[in-house]
């Protein structure tokens, strides 16, 4: 997996765009059982990421669900990790728009369905969400297009690019 680390370093340095990187990372599972990959994603999320969930975000999502809001998770991260993550928030698998590929008879292919990033996030949302988007939350510059289509936009623990854009647009910025 040294090549994957090197490729990720290229992405972090700006040599590879997010759509390409996330597309490559989801297609590399080609030929594997989706059940096996989903279990591995769940174990990874639970052991490495779940403890980093901001309690205030968990509480906010819970309150929004309780008030009847239609909540979607939109991410360029692979669908398997996002499914595992959304279990912690009570968000249905049918409300996930993430990097994904076609699966045939339980086996992952290398045929991309979507990689929602940048403009692709707002396009993916418009394909499935009817009406106006009340609120959107993002943490990187790849979320700007999605944040721009919401009535209320929130930059949560934003990277410097998004923080600058959020200040310029007078969006709410939150650092936990």
Task: Kindly give the residue locations of the regions a language model identified.
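C-terminal cap/substrate-recognition subdomain and adjoining C-terminal extension
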Residues: 30-176
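Conserved phosphoryl-transfer catalytic core
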Residues: 1-14
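Secretory-pathway/luminal and periplasmic proteins that interact with or process carbohydrate-rich
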Residues: 13-16, 91
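Extracytoplasmic ligand-binding site segments that recognize negatively charged/polar headgroups
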Residues: 16, 20-31
């Amino acid at each position: 997996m040294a090549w994957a680390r090197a490729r990720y370093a290229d992405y972090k340095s700006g040599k590879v765009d997010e759509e390409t990187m996330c597309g490559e990372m989801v297609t590399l599972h080609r030929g594997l059982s989706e059940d096996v990959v989903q279990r591995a994603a769940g174990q990874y999320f639970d052991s490495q990421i779940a403890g980093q969930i901001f309690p205030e975000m968990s509480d906010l999502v819970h309150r929004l669900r309780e008030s009847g809001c239609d909540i979607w998770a939109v991410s360029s991260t692979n669908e398997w990790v996002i499914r595992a993550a959304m279990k912690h928030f009570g968000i249905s698998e049918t409300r996930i728009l993430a990097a994904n590929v076609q699966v045939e008879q339980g086996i992952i292919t290398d045929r991309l369905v979507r990689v929602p990033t940048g403009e692709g996030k707002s396009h993916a949302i418009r394909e499935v969400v009817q009406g106006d988007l009340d609120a959107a939350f993002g943490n990187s510059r790849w979320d700007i297009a999605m944040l721009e289509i919401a009535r209320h936009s929130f930059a949560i623990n934003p990277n410097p690019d998004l923080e600058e854009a959020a200040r310029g647009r007078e969006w709410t910025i939150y650092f936990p």
